[in-house]
A protein has these predicted regions:
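Non-transmembrane, aqueous-exposed alpha-helical and coiled segments at domain scale
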Residues: 1-301
């Protein structure tokens, strides 16, 4: 997976993308790399960026991918056939385990701001979680609102950069936007509350288990990254983590509902507790994919 910056001459090969991963299974079947089963075809995908395997369950019939369906994803127009993505043994993409610092929470000293409690969690992708209120936010912010607030964007990037430096991804947090723009993903969370989505839909706090906003390449994600949801699900079962602190106590870990700018994303986690710490077996969720184009791109040398 390669992430191309839209405002810098930069391509990052760090981390993975769950939304892009959802298209790999259908492509593999379309190209004959995997034989289609009748009903559901499971495609095991090895992601070289993270050295992890993702199992994609794709609906198939008569040797072909079934794209049409009635499954809808919040923030994505239309409906399609669901693709179940299961991230197997997702912890430790950086080679340092689920908690790469060894702690459920760490305190970062942010220059010009002060101490900030964070949870740095690595499952599917490494994320740095912080409570919205710690940064003067609510968790109800929308991308159009936050992306024009230069001071908040700078603060969020500074926290992310300090986390990146702590992880050894850069030797100076000020260089993180260039040296490691994609990971860790900056994410701020809050307790469930009523809010309005980007398209004006009113969401009730009873329908979600927490509020969350993700940053991607220094801007607010319009909805929620799938790998981010996987890491959020894993973080939800870590005792004392920032995510667990704001999570609805009655939340079902097989059905965690994340309230994001586009609506609600549902995800889950399978795990075992050993010595009061979770061992993550897998995290899972649903995406869709549609065939948009078949063609030839001519690359000039």
């Amino acid at each position: 997976f390669a992430q191309v910056s839209v405002d810098k001459p930069l391509v990052s090969y760090k981390g993975n993308c769950g939304n892009i991963s959802s298209g790999v299974g259908p492509f593999a079947i379309e190209k004959g790399l995997v034989n289609a089963e009748e009903g559901t075809t499971t495609v095991r995908i090895y992601n070289t960026n993270t050295d992890k395997v993702i199992a994609a369950d794709v609906t198939t019939s008569n040797g072909h991918v079934v794209y049409d369906g009635d499954f809808q994803i919040a923030g994505v127009p239309g409906t399609a056939s669901p693709i179940r993505l299961k991230f197997l043994d997702p912890a430790g993409t950086l080679g340092k385990g689920l908690l790469p610092t060894g702690n459920a929470t760490d305190t970062l000293e942010i220059p010009g701001f002060g101490p900030v409690e964070v949870s740095i969690v690595d499952a599917a992708n490494p994320l740095v979680f912080v409570k919205a209120e710690t940064l003067g936010l609510t968790g109800r912010e929308l991308p159009d609102e936050l992306n024009v607030d230069e001071k908040k964007l700078e603060l969020l990037e500074t926290v992310r950069g300090m986390a990146a430096q702590k992880l050894g991804l850069t030797d100076d947090y000020k260089k993180s936007a260039w040296e490691t723009p994609g990971i860790p993903k900056m994410t701020f969370v809050a307790k469930a509350d009523n809010y309005v989505t980007s398209d004006g839909k009113e969401m009730k706090k009873e329908d979600i288990d927490l509020l969350s906003r993700m940053m991607s390449m220094q801007k607010t994600h319009p909805s929620y990254a799938m790998t981010g949801a996987m890491c959020t699900a894993a973080a939800a079962v870590i005792p004392g983590s920032v995510v667990q602190q704001v999570l609805n106590p009655a939340a079902d870990t097989q059905f965690i509902r994340i309230g994001h700018p586009g609506g609600v994303l549902e995800c889950g986690v399978d795990y075992e507790m050993k010595e009061n710490q979770p061992v993550i077996e897998d995290t899972f969720g649903f995406r869709t994919a549609n065939l948009l184009l078949k063609g030839t791109a001519v690359i000039r040398k």
